[in-house]
Every structure is written in C-alpha cells, then in structure tokens.
From Swiss-Prot:
Function noted in UniProt: NDH-1 shuttles electrons from NADH, via FMN and iron-sulfur (Fe-S) centers, to quinones in the respiratory chain. The immediate electron acceptor for the enzyme in this species is believed to be ubiquinone. Couples the redox reaction to proton translocation (for every two electrons transferred, four hydrogen ions are translocated across the cytoplasmic membrane), and thus conserves the redox energy in a proton gradient.
Name of the protein in question: NADH-quinone oxidoreductase subunit K
Transmembrane region(s): 4-24, 28-48, 60-80
GO biological process, one term: ATP synthesis coupled electron transport
C-alpha cells in the first residue's frame, strides 16, 4: 500500500503540472489535456485517501471524476472543432473574436 503522503504529493505534483500547462499554453488542445491532468490528479487524491482509510468512497469519487472528465472532453473537443473550422487555428485568443 502506498503511504498517504506519497500519494498526495504525487497528486499535488500532477495538479501543479496541469495548472502550469493550463496557464502557459494558448493552444486549446493542450489546455484540454492539462485540464484532464488536473482532474485525474484530484481523482488520484480521492483514491489514495480512500485506500488509506479502507473506504470505497475514494473509488466512487473517481468514477464521478471520470464521468465529469468525459463530459468536459466531449464539450471541449466540440468547441475545438468549431474553432478550427471557423478560424483554422487552435489559439484560444481567437475565441474572443468569435462573438457575434
């Protein structure tokens, strides 16, 4: 069994990497990938905490996080396709120009 501190440190590192990618990148695809990393880091923290205390709640929250990530990915990819069709780019700065 993985100690609680090691699992939470790994989850924090993954969350920080995802947040860094989300803030630095301007490409919508990379931003979606970074957001997926952040969601998976939070789900990992739930699973680690649940396994330490012998509860199944962490695994239930993981299933909820995976379903949330699937919904987020489908909506994000639909927006990505529309942005690529209309502007022929994936730069997030052009989204503000799509109003209208």
């Amino acid at each position: 069994m993985i100690p609680l501190q090691h699992g939470l440190i790994l989850a924090a590192i993954l969350f920080a990497l995802g947040l860094t990618g989300l803030l630095i990148r301007r490409n919508l695809l990379f931003m979606l990938i970074s957001l997926e990393i952040m969601i998976n880091a939070a789900a990992l923290a739930f699973v680690v905490a649940g396994s330490v205390w012998g509860q199944a709640d962490g695994q239930v929250m993981y299933i909820l996080a995976i379903s949330l990530a699937a919904a987020e990915a489908s909506i994000g990819l639909a927006l990505l396709l529309q942005l690529h069709r209309r502007r022929n780019t994936l730069n997030i700065d052009t989204v503000s120009e799509m109003r209208g």
